């Protein structure tokens, strides 16, 4: 449908934005694709040379990712895992990418997730959140009237200023600073990217 087309275009623009914030050459780097879905970003990271841990709560999406990419040369660099991004104990990463996954947590849980991930990350975290705006609130309300197949999973919008204040006040993120930000808004897809960079 037309709705799905605008969502697909928006997601593609957001995916390209987040990927552009990571180094072109990721050889020897460990990257977490948090909430990897069907692994579209994971395979792009692997093509850049990264060793990727790709985690998602959905077993069916992980199975689909394994089926889709098992014949590709880069597949051996990706470890697809069914599980919670907050419970990867003992792993260390150079970068974390979380596209449209933290947006499903309420604000406090989203912040706690970033704090938990930050403990195991050496360089940067790039992620998206649903910005609390009047147009998004209106779309959210209107969206409830669409057929279930056209509806997006539940999201938890947060005002950018509130998120920035929460990040600034977090005792767990004192070594991190906010880098780039970018909002994508195409029809029924609205999401905002943010970069957190660990200070040297």
Regions found by a protein language model. Give the residues of each.
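Conserved class I S-adenosyl-L-methionine
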Residues: 1-25
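Short, glycine-/aromatic-enriched active-site segment of Class I SAM-dependent methyltransferases
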Residues: 136-153
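Short alpha-helix
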Residues: 154-172
